[in-house]
Amino acid sequence: KRKRPHQPAPFTRVRAQRITDKEGFQTVSTGYLDYMLDELEIFLIPDKKLVTDAGYTEFRTNALAEYQDTIHAHGLVMVPVKQTKEDGITLIQGGDLLIHYTSENDKQEKIDKMRACILAIYKDATKDFFR
């Protein structure tokens, strides 16, 4: 298991941290949202970069499966690992997300979309805690 910096973030915003590992993967960590979301990791993969199943095994997953409808409602594409689309966003094992991008603009658009989605999920997940 690789170790990641773990900094609790304020509840009102999503703070992203960018980490590039030795294989050239970029990880955007959104910080600590709450115990239900645990730590959501977004992996950015340049277009055409091959990622094998073995490459996924190091990444920790979390319990996002129950929020799939929310994610779909925000227009994000999720496909099983075996059927990743180069321009899509992939949910792995009901947990972490992979974003495949084709350009800097495309990458930024997908990150912004994902951030909005995370905030929507977070608000939904915490609505009973913060009234």
Q: Residue locations for each model-derived region?
A:
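Hydrophobic, aromatic-enriched interface-forming segments
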Residues: K113-R131
